[in-house]
Structures are given as C-alpha cells and as structure tokens.
Curated annotation (Swiss-Prot):
This is pH-response regulator protein palH/RIM21. The keyword rRNA-binding does not apply. Its main location: membrane. The chain crosses the membrane at residues 95-115, 128-148, 179-199, 210-230, 248-268, 281-301, 308-328. Residues 516-527 have a biased composition (Polar residues). The modification Phosphoserine is found at residue 409. The keyword Cytoplasm does not apply. It is a multi-pass membrane protein. Keywords: Cell membrane, Membrane, Phosphoprotein, Transmembrane, Transmembrane helix. Residues 116-127, 200-209, 269-280, 329-533 are cytoplasmic. One of its GO terms (cellular component) is plasma membrane. Residues 452-473, 494-533 are annotated as: Disordered.
Length: 533
C-alpha cells in the first residue's frame, strides 16, 4: 500500500474487527444436529478481518437465513460499502470488477502485440520497430504471469478462508518482483519508442538531435526513480522513507505523458488536410487522439483516487501499448499519403541544409561546378573556335577526379597563409571540446538514422525492388560476366546534307560542257560518289 494515497487512520474504523462481549443467553446450533443447540453463558465475537478490514462473503444468503446479524456487523457493512477505495466494499472495487478490468487489459495488450508483430513493418525503421515488438511481448508476458498469480491466490484464499478478496490482488503490484521488473523494462522500451515517434514527426536534423537527447534523459530518469520504491521494499527496512518519492515521480510521468500527447495532437492538427480526405484515416486519427490522451488521463484519475486507484499499473501498461502501437500505425499511413502528395506536387519534398551528413548536397554541387569549369577551360584551350554543346556534359569520372576537398582542406582559405602554431591553451581546449561535440553529434545521428530511420534525402531501395531487378537480369542473361545490352540509334550528321548539295551543283556544271567535259565529269562523279560512299 502506498502511504501517500491512504493514511493509516482511514483503516481503523470497523468495530466488528475488535473483540465484542455478547454476554449470556445465546444459543449456538450444533453443526451435526439439526434440532439441537448449546446454551453459552459468555461469548466473545470478532469478525474475520484482514489488515483491520472485515471480509464479507458476496453471496445471496444475506436474507435467506432466519437469524439476524449483529448490529455491529450490520453497521460495519453499511460503512464498508460506502468506502470508494480498494480497501472498501463498493461495487467498483468488488472482485468481479477487478477481474474484469485485468482480463480486459490483458486481451487488449495481446491483441495489439499480435498486430505489432504481424501488420506493422518498415525497413527504414527496423531498429525502433524491433524495440516496439520486444516491449509489446514483455507487456503481454507480464500480464499473463500476473493473471496466473492472481487466479492462484484467489483459489488459495477460497479454499482456506472461503472468501475471495480484491484487497490481496493489489499487493502483487508492489510485492511481486517479477511484475515490477517486467513492467519496468516494458515501460522503459515503450517510452524509447515514443521518443522515436516524436523524432519521426520532425524533419530537421537539429530538431531530431534535441528530441533524442532530451527524450532519452527524461525517460531514463523517470523510470529509475519510479523503480526505486518497489526495490527498497525488499532490500531495506525503512521502506516507508521511500514512499515520499513516488508522488513526485508520478507527477513527472504525468508531465512526460502530457508532453507526448500534446506533440502528437499538434502534429495531427497540422496534417488535418491529409487525413480528413479519407474516412478510414479519419477514424484512425480519432482513435489516435483518444489513446494518447488516455495515458495522462489515467495518471490523473489514479492520483485523484478514483475507481482505478491502485489498478493504475495494469491500465498504464495497456495505455503505453495502445498509445505507441496505434500512433505508429497512424504515422506510417500518414507518411504514405505525404509521399503521394509530394510525388504529385511540382515542388516535391522539402530539403533542408543539414539534412545530409557532412553537407553532401553542397559538396556534390561544388564538384559538379568545378568539373564543368575545368571541362570548359580545357575545351577552350584545345579549340577556341569549335563551340559544341558537348562541352557542358559532365561525366562521373571528371566529377570524381576533381574534388575541391582534395585540394583545399576544410576550414582553410586559399587567400590565407597558415603556420604550424599550437595556439593558446584556450584555443586548444575549445578545439578539443568542439571535436568531442562533433563526435557525439555524429554518433547521435548514426543512432537516429539506424534506429528511427534514414534522412529524407537518402535514396534507399527496398528488397523487393532488388529481387525483381535480379530476376529480370537473370532472364536476360545479364547475370553472367562480359554480357551487355546495347541499344541502336539513328545518327544524322550535318556534313551529309552539305556533301549532297555540293554533288548536285557539280553535276549541273558538267552537263553544260561538251563531250570531253562529259568524260571528265563522269570520272569526277564516280570519284566523288566513291568518296561519299
């Protein structure tokens, strides 16, 4: 039991849990004889209680017995059913409602785990998708073990005491270390997946870096602080000293869940023109809004001591599964719609300056410009009068040969003379810090690209396309070495038309002269014709 939720004074309120002197004049019916009884002179009665709370049998035998209950027992029963708490007897906290809520969460978690393992796929987000599947499997396994232990405990209490109590189920959340460890690992992985989802919502590399650093730090801090009190209950004697930590960590988790829900809902509002066009996408969007709001909603309801108080761990696991899996599916479908719209648009997709590592777009543009400049200068030096359109063609060999980075190092200018000076200690320290920062950013970008996905400008081919190309090459016989495909093309030169016009002019001149000229013209025509052929 968490002391920050319930104070000890609320539990000591039932008089039937204390011994009561009934006095004399009581007849007790013998269990083996129907029409016999024993007269008792002095009787002390005390109800069966567990942790200073009476245990009642939820059956229909209350009014069927001809004997009445004691006044203290009746008063305690009326008080018991008015307590809206997990130690009370209200209908919300009856054993039937608790079992129904636990099994419902178990069914939802297993269903979403199956969907995550079968339906959701993505080669660009392979690492984070594997983490999501592992987290879903851990959550399903944890709830399976939890329900098994609950049923065994209820069976034991039914056989020993003849009653089943919802109160005993609540102790499993904090006393069972298997549930605590698996819940800690599943929650940690789900929050890492939520960090990956938020990273996918943004396009700039700098924004992804900031989200990665802040999200990982907040996730690790919140989960480590959350798991300290359950472990302290089993390792230290002063277990009540750590209970003061839980309300602050609970508020911390509420803030993280609210931030995640706010970011997702804001992105949904920004993309309303896409998902509003399709009915199925609209229903999935409404479901996404509902599930991302359930997590902070259940946190607040658990703190406010409503029906799910002390059942929050089961509901939190289900909320983490739904808010992660359904949001991931919605984001995948939204990306498909965005790619279709960008393909039909004139502008296409946006390209940011820092989208590629090491400024690949800028370097490629510099290489192309340098190669074109060198090609034009070489053509001008060899033949200044021959201007052809082929001089503007830039082949890959020329681009790869002339690289401005091979001649001018990064960070140096051609108009400045550099010496091998070590500089001051401040400059060296700043240089070392800058180098360390660049390395950290580099590894961060590698983690983000490999786990969350590639950048927008990277052209990645899927496996199916490669398989189809390999099949076509095999059918054509191109998989063998030394085999190529050539395409025929008709080429017309401008010099052919000029030669034909010159030949016609010479024929006209030869027909005007005499027979001697005719012989010469025929020889000339023949030689010209042969030369033309």
């Amino acid at each position: 039991m968490n002391l920050w939720r319930h104070s000890p004074e609320e539990l000591a309120a039932y008089n039937s849990c204390h011994p009561m002197k009934l006095g004399s004049g009581v007849l007790i019916q013998l269990p083996l004889y129907d029409n016999s009884a024993v007269y008792a002179e002095d009787i002390t009665f005390r109800s069966f209680c567990c942790e200073r709370v009476p245990v009642y049998v939820s059956t229909v035998l209350r009014n069927s017995s001809p004997y009445r209950y004691l006044d203290e027992v009746i008063n305690d029963w009326q008080k018991f059913i008015q307590v809206s708490d997990y130690v009370g007897g209200s209908a919300e906290y009856a054993i039937y409602a608790v079992i129904l809520s636990i099994t419902s969460n178990f069914v939802i978690t297993v269903f979403l785990t199956v969907i995550c393992c079968i339906n959701i796929s993505g080669r660009a987000y392979k690492r984070i998708l594997q983490l999501l599947r592992i987290a879903s499997l851990l959550a399903s396994l944890n709830l399976t073990i939890f329900i098994t232990k609950v049923l065994r405990r209820l069976e034991k209490e039914h056989n020993v005491y003849g009653v089943v109590r919802a109160h005993s189920i609540m102790h499993i959340f904090s006393d069972d270390m298997t549930f605590v460890v698996l819940d800690f690992l599943a929650t940690l992985m789900f929050q890492f997946c939520q960090v990956g989802i938020v990273i996918r919502l943004f396009q700039r590399a700098q924004e992804k870096r900031i989200i990665f650093f802040i999200g990982v730090i907040l996730t690790i801090t919140a989960n480590i602080l959350w798991v300290i009190p359950p472990f302290a209950n089993h390792t230290t004697k002063h277990r009540n000293d750590w209970q003061i930590l839980r309300p602050f960590v609970y508020l911390f988790r509420i803030a993280i869940a609210t931030s995640y829900a706010s970011i997702v809902i804001y992105h949904i509002w920004q993309k309303k023109k896409l998902w509003f066009k399709f009915n199925q996408m609209g229903l999935l969007t409404l479901l996404t809004i509902l599930v991302v709001l359930l997590l902070p909603g259940f946190f607040l309801a658990d703190v406010s001591n409503l029906w799910i108080s002390e059942l929050g761990e089961v509901f939190n696991t289900t909320c983490y599964v739904t808010s992660t899996v359904i949001t991931w599916e919605w984001l995948d479908r939204l990306n498909v719609l965005e790619r279709k719209e960008e393909a039909q648009s004139i502008l296409g997709r946006p390209i940011f300056e820092e989208e590629q590592q090491d400024y690949r777009f800028a370097k490629y543009a510099l290489r192309v410009q340098n190669a074109l400049t060198r090609r034009e200068s070489q053509d001008a030096s060899t033949d200044r009068h021959d201007t052809s359109s082929n001089s503007e063609v830039c082949d890959l060999q020329t681009i790869s040969r002339y690289d401005p980075e091979d001649q001018i190092s990064v960070g140096r200018s051609i108009d400045r003379m550099h010496f091998n000076d070590r500089g001051t200690y401040k400059d060296v320290a700043l240089k070392k810090l800058g180098y360390a920062r660049d390395k950290i950013l580099y590894f961060t970008d590698q983690i983000v690209q490999k786990s969350v996905g590639h950048n927008n400008s990277s052209s990645s081919k899927n496996e199916k396309t490669k398989q189809r190309k390999a099949m076509v090459r095999k059918r054509l016989g191109l998989d063998k070495p030394g085999i190529y495909i050539y395409s025929t093309k008709d080429v017309v030169f401008n010099s052919d038309e000029d030669d034909d016009e010159n030949a016609e002019d010479e024929d006209d001149d030869e027909y005007e002269v005499g027979s001697e000229g005719n012989n010469n013209s025929s020889a000339t025509f023949t030689s010209d014709h042969i030369g033309h052929i």
